[in-house]
Regions:
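A glycosyltransferase accessory/donor-loop signature
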Residues: 2-313, 319, 444-633
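Conserved beta-strand termini and adjacent loop/short-helix elements that scaffold enzyme active sites
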Residues: 149-151, 238, 336-338, 357-361, ...
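Short, acidic, metal-binding catalytic loop of nucleotide-sugar glycosyltransferases
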Residues: 323-331
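Amphipathic alpha-helical interface elements that mediate macromolecular binding in regulatory proteins
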Residues: 219, 315-318, 322, 347, ...
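Glycosyltransferase specificity loop/lid
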Residues: 80, 337-346
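Hydrophobic/aromatic residues located in beta-strands of well-ordered beta-sheets
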Residues: 235, 333-334
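GT-A fold catalytic core of metal-dependent nucleotide-sugar glycosyltransferases
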Residues: 343, 350-367, 371-434
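Short active-site oxyanion
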Residues: 331-333, 389-390
Length: 633
């Protein structure tokens, strides 16, 4: 007793507008390696001059050394790589790129013979293998042409933090964000239909955020898409850790044995992916310009959200649906609900336009019992919506102010930045796939989430993601360090008509759990950073546009009314200077009772006592909304 549904996930305290406080700019220096040609000149000698015996020995030694280098497997064969001179495979030892795992040739042969037939490979490109492994490739696939591909290593100052900075200047006020350069593989003059790459996999929790590992996979993808013609190109990785799941997808995985992964990528789709920035160091979509337009395949695209263990978000989901329709989108709306959501509440969701699908909850094995994050891995069920090609997931506590259908044209995972190198999962593009769902489930016992929730877990799986402007998931939040000018700028964005923001994400206490008269975040000091009367009024404007039939799903329980009054009294005692505690509440919901203890004021006499339970505040379940009454919607 004495607590309200105010649990806030960690992500809600980490707004996309990180730049307002930190403004960390990554200094990038461009380095260019200059190769100095190795010249070996022998001057003509006069017919009258004779070499001494010592000079003759020296000449023979140099010649023998040159011949050995020329035929060494460590260098390029110029007949295999047009326009390229002899180069070393490693270009010098770089520990970032070295992989010490053993190559299991039985697994390689098993996969290639079963899935393709090893004799089908006319040309095999080899990346990041040592001399012994190259010899084994030639021995096991002796009918193929083998090309040893050289990849210049990334500069030492290219770090994961420079590829995925916490903040970039999206508005280009002081600089144009530019990603660090990662060298590409040069397309050889011969046809390749298999590109084999050996990937490093560091020990430790952060193995998936590895510049060399990303570089090798991105380079392989770029080379695969560079070939002309309508023939398949296979990509084979040797690694103990799974490859980037949204660059080379599990739907394209045709064979996996041990540490061998064989893909047949969709080259058209992959070609679009490699055109995107390599990290979140640049926007994947423009900040400004003409209104973004996307047609796509509407029947195979949907907005989706999820409700589990909390009917208090039903009102928020209904308002979110209303905002999507007001933005002009006609895409399907799909909501996943568990068994805790009553038939009454499901009928309200359906009346609002949501296609309701019941799911079985997924427990977070690392969460405490009854904790806020105990069941939030249920979000993984989104990947089982395989009757859709693309999903735009939205949290149930936001409003769509402008049409964002164009995000259906973006790949998985497209999202706004959160903090550090991470994305905010409150709005994200998902590509449903049963095998991706299985990937998520396979690792829930081993992968640690930074915030204990689904957002942290997804950030460990999908480390390669695409940044969109924060206006597409703008958090209702003011940093303590925000100057008044910055606060006023945000307030202007919250209330702008026509809207400037695409999405407004309501953090802190939710608008429908406050009285509509003002934002109740003002009455608790720990929530002041989320308080905005302008944003609050914006939400209620959408609420009032909903069919009146749906307003009943936003009524307040008696316990919540008591909580709001308790917080107001505490604000009065503390004499908060904003003065919201002085405002007389006129919200008509104050006098509407939906449970069996309507005298909420009497609850305040015992507020906070530990021997109280919620049992006596049982809320009767009203009858479902009749579908016959929906004709007016």
């Amino acid at each position: 007793m004495g607590t309200s549904p105010r649990s806030i996930e960690t992500r809600h305290r980490l707004p996309a507008s990180i730049e307002d406080l930190y403004k960390r700019k990554v200094q990038r220096s461009k380095t260019k390696d200059v190769e100095k040609p190795f010249h070996l000149s022998i001057q003509d000698r006069s017919s009258r001059c004779k070499f001494s015996f010592l000079k003759l020995i020296l000449l023979v030694t140099i010649s023998a050394t040159f011949v050995m280098l020329l035929y060494s497997p460590e260098v390029y064969n110029t007949s295999h790589l047009s326009g390229s001179g002899a180069r070393w495979i490693w270009g010098g030892s770089d520990p970032r790129y070295i992989s010490n795992i053993d190559t299991d040739w039985d697994d390689i042969l098993k996969i290639t013979e079963k899935m393709i037939g090893k004799n089908e490979f006319q040309g095999i490109g080899l990346v990041n293998f040592n001399n012994t492994e190259i010899s084994n490739w030639k021995h096991n696939f002796h009918d193929a042409t083998h090309v040893v591909l050289h990849l210049e290593h990334a500069a030492n100052n290219v770090t994961w933090e420079s590829l995925y900075p916490e903040w970039i200047d999206e508005e280009e006020e002081t600089e144009v964000p530019v990603c660090p350069s990662l060298p590409s593989l040069v397309s050889p003059g011969t046809r390749l239909n298999l590109i084999a790459v050996k990937l490093p996999c560091r020990n430790g929790d952060n193995w998936s955020r590895d510049v060399a590992r990303l570089h090798l996979q991105f380079a392989a993808a770029g080379l695969a898409t560079s070939f002309k013609g309508n023939y398949p190109v296979y990509v084979l990785f040797i690694t103990n850790c799974f490859p980037i799941p949204n660059l080379f997808t599990c739907k394209e995985l045709i064979g996996h044995e041990g540490n061998v992964w064989l893909y047949r990528p969709n080259l058209s789709v992959l070609r679009e992916k490699v055109q995107l920035p390599v990290g979140s160091c640049e926007l994947a979509l423009p900040m400004r310009g003409k209104e973004l337009v996307y047609n796509g395949n509407a029947p195979r695209e949907a907005y989706a959200t999820i409700l589990h263990s909390a009917h208090v978000y039903v009102c928020g989901a209904i308002a979110a649906a209303q905002s999507i329709r007001m933005s002009g989108s006609s895409r399907d709306l799909v909501i996943l609900v568990d068994e805790t959501i009553s038939e009454y509440h499901k009928s309200g969701l359906e009346a609002a336009g949501w296609k309701v699908r019941k799911i079985q909850r997924i427990r977070n094995p690392k969460a405490e019992k009854d904790a806020y994050n105990e069941w939030n891995y249920s979000k993984f069920r989104l990947w089982q919506l395989t009757d859709y090609d693309k999903i735009i997931f939205i949290d149930a506590d936001l409003l769509i102010l402008r049409n964002i259908d164009f995000l259906f044209g973006m790949p998985e995972i497209t999202a706004t930045g959160n903090n550090a190198t991470l994305f905010n999962s409150g709005v994200m593009v998902v590509e449903p796939s049963n095998c991706t769902f299985q990937l998520l489930m396979d690792h829930i016992n081993e992968i640690e989430s930074y915030n204990g929730g689904d957002q942290g877990y997804l950030n460990e799986i999908f480390t390669w993601w695409h940044r969109i402007p924060r206006h597409m998931n703008f958090l209702k939040h003011f940093w303590i360090g925000d100057e008044e000018e910055k606060k006023q700028m945000k307030t202007t964005l919250f209330g702008a008509e026509p809207p400037i923001l695409y999405v407004l994400h309501y953090l802190g206490l939710k608008p429908w759990l406050c009285f509509r008269d003002y934002d109740c975040n003002w009455n608790a000091d720990i929530f002041h950073e989320f308080a905005s009367d302008v944003a609050h009024a914006k939400w209620w404007k959408v609420h009032d546009a909903m069919p009146e039939l749906l307003h009943q799903f936003c009524l307040l329980q008696s316990k919540q009314k008591a909580q709001l009054e308790w917080d107001r009294r505490q604000a009065e005692i503390a004499n908060y200077t904003d003065g919201h505690w002085r405002i007389k509440v006129k919200d008509h919901r104050l006098n509407k009772c939906i449970d069996n203890l309507c005298n909420w004021k009497s609850m305040l006499r015992h507020w906070g006592e530990s021997n109280w339970t919620d049992n006596e505040f049982f809320t009767p379940t009203p009858p479902t909304v009749a579908t016959s009454s929906l004709s007016a919607l």
